[in-house]
Amino acid sequence: MSAHLQWMVVRNCSSFLIKRNKQTYSTEPNNLKARNSFRYNGLIHRKTVGVEPAADGKGVVVVIKRRSGQRKPATSYVRTTINKNARATLSSIRHMIRKNKYRPDLRMAAIRRASAILRSQKPVMVKRKRTRPTKSS
């Protein structure tokens, strides 16, 4: 079944839809922007890219759908864990998408998603308030 036909079926009635504040969002896997649109839908396309946080809380997992074996959902996804520094991680994602000519329209969205995940994994520095000495008159 073509992606366009699947989109016509899924776009208004899906268990992943969230309709709030005059906007429609989607919680489906491999939807990089969580937006209910044809381009970012993670279910209907033959090629999809997903970026998730790693299970141990360090690094990201890039999920790419295989072009072959579409009829076997259990083996149709390849999961690659990238646990490097931020610049190398983003460079790896960029190369995975660009060098394989794999959905170049999703390249920037995947990089932004990975960047946000890496930023959320950084430890937060607690700022201490400076105490002023009391004035003595």
Swiss-Prot record:
Modified residues (Phosphoserine): 115
Location within or outside the cell: Cytoplasm
Swiss-Prot/TrEMBL GO biological process terms: cytoplasmic translation; translation
Pfam families: Ribosomal_L28e
Chain positions with N-acetylserine modification: 2
Gene3D superfamilies in alphabetical order: 3.30.390.110
Positions bearing the Glycyl lysine isopeptide (Lys-Gly) (interchain with G-Cter in SUMO2) cross-link: 58, 65
Keywords, in A-Z order: Acetylation, Cytoplasm, Isopeptide bond, Phosphoprotein, Ribonucleoprotein, Ribosomal protein, Ubl conjugation
GO CC, alphabetical: cell body; cytoplasm; cytoplasmic ribonucleoprotein granule; cytosol; cytosolic large ribosomal subunit; cytosolic ribosome; dendrite; extracellular exosome
PANTHER family, per database record: 60S RIBOSOMAL PROTEIN L28
UniProt subunit comment: Component of the large ribosomal subunit.
Family: Belongs to the eukaryotic ribosomal protein eL28 family.
Protein name listed in UniProt: Large ribosomal subunit protein eL28
Taxonomic source organism: Homo sapiens (Human)
Gene this chain is encoded by: RPL28
